[in-house]
Amino acid sequence: MNSCKRFPRSARICLPSEYYVAFEQGRRYSSVLLRLHHLPTSGPVRLGLVVSRRVDIRAVNRNRIKRALREVMRQIAYKLVPGDYVVVVRQTAKDVSNAELSVALLSLLRRIGALPLASIDNAMLPFFERNCSRK
């Protein structure tokens, strides 16, 4: 992947203390595949992912799930309400496709009001491409 299309460090939740705050103070929403903790903030949209070994013992499969969810968030981050979003993947997500994970995350985001009900296009985000030089 081109480095200019990656999640910048400012768009990720990195520290355990930041996860703790989102878990303790944020609102929790659940679906069959995912649990979402949302903490509204005045800063940018930030994403944290939790995929435990209970979901799948193989790291390859856990990383596939994280890549799929990260890609969805990368594409829609500019449409979201500012805040911290921590996605906890449930065991039922082990054998589902990337498309099903995407639909589950989008429906959760719509349900909490963080994403407009309009259709999502696959346009690249200006937020993540602003420092990208095209040749």
From Swiss-Prot:
Protein name (database record): Ribonuclease P protein component
Cysteine pairs bridged by disulfides in the record: none
Reactions it catalyzes: Endonucleolytic cleavage of RNA, removing 5'-extranucleotides from tRNA precursor
Keywords, ordered alphabetically: Endonuclease, Hydrolase, Nuclease, RNA-binding, tRNA processing
Sections of the chain in a coiled coil: none
Matching HAMAP family: RNase_P
Superkingdom in the source lineage: Bacteria
One GO MF term: ribonuclease P activity
Major enzyme class: hydrolase
Complex formation: Consists of a catalytic RNA component (M1 or rnpB) and a protein subunit.
InterPro entries: Ribosomal_Su5_D2-typ_SF (IPR020568), Ribsml_uS5_D2-typ_fold_subgr (IPR014721), RNase_P (IPR000100), RNase_P_CS (IPR020539)
SUPFAM superfamilies recorded: Ribosomal protein S5 domain 2-like
Residues that span the membrane, as ranges: none
GO aspect biological process, one term: tRNA 5'-leader removal
EC number, as in UniProt: 3.1.26.5
GO cellular component: ribonuclease P complex
Similarity comment: Belongs to the RnpA family.
Gene name of the record: rnpA
Known function: RNaseP catalyzes the removal of the 5'-leader sequence from pre-tRNA to produce the mature 5'-terminus. It can also cleave other RNA substrates such as 4.5S RNA. The protein component plays an auxiliary but essential role in vivo by binding to the 5'-leader sequence and broadening the substrate specificity of the ribozyme.
